[in-house]
Amino acid sequence: MRIDIITIFPDYFGPVGPSGRVGASGPLGVSLIGKAGARGDIDFRVHDLRSWAADVHHTVDDTPFGGGPGMVMKADVWGDALDAVLADASAGTARLVVPAPSGTPFTQELAAGYARETHLVFACGRYEGIDSRVAADAQTRMTVDEVSIGDYVLAGGEAAVSVIVEAVCRLLPGVLGNEQSNRDDSFGGTGGAMSGLLEGPVYTRPRTWRERTVPDVLLSGNHRVIARWQRDEALRRTAVNRPDLIRRLAAAPDGLDKRDRQVLADAGFPVDTENMAH
């Protein structure tokens, strides 16, 4: 996969070398994703938006038409940047992702969809955002997504891009040491035992720590019983923290079996009524 990131703060993603290649530090150069980049499995390229600003001050923003506070990032600068980044890309293969509080919520399902792409381009906005004509123009050449990572506002798109890139790249083949890890993720929709649920509690050695012991069931060696316990715990946690996910499962064919519904009812979250108890 090729990932291009356009930003006015390229150093946010680590030291940038020739052709926008990222060095072995920063969020793109560390951990398993950094190793995937070093192997060439992921081609990261980071570009300084100011490189396409024509004036001596490398201006990338201007006052908004219609008035109002703040500044808006200029269409001409962004247009030239996207033209240059896409110049050596195969026609129709790139997908543009623009983080924005007003965008579509970013989900695990969307991350899985992005992981099937061959080329992602991220546009890191700042100030009041990017002139809306940039996305409209880009849509004539590629799919364009405005994506929100949550109901809050950041100073710029760089942090959001880091979140999205990590969520996507860990789903690529060979990035994680154990591919099974993806199947039982929170929000996993790949048919694992935790599909549609938040992941439950996890434990490791020592068995006893500060007088707190690991649940005996996890030491039993009975994988069927362990799997059931893990699902029960996931159901309880999801009901408390994300009841909307339980409602979604309850409405889906085969989303919850009889045991699931009993576990939830015992925990005070009956799902056979329109509104669950809390």
What does each model-identified segment do?
Residues 177-208:
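A cross-family acyltransferase "interaction/gating" segment
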Residues 1, 196-197, 202-278:
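SAM-dependent methyltransferases
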Residues 16-25, 90-91, 273-277:
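Intrinsically disordered, low-complexity terminal tails and inter-domain linkers enriched
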Residues 73-131, 173:
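S-adenosyl-L-methionine/SAH cofactor-binding core of RNA-modifying enzymes
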Residues 9, 99-101, 123-125, 150, ...:
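Short His-Asn-centered micro-motif
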Residues 130, 134-189:
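Structured adenosyl-cofactor binding patch, chiefly the S-adenosyl-L-methionine
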Residues 4-6, 45-47, 97, 120-122, ...:
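Hydrophobic/aromatic beta-strand patches that form the interior of the parallel beta-sheet core
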Residues 1-85, 224-247:
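N-terminal nucleotide/polyanion-binding subdomain common to many enzyme families
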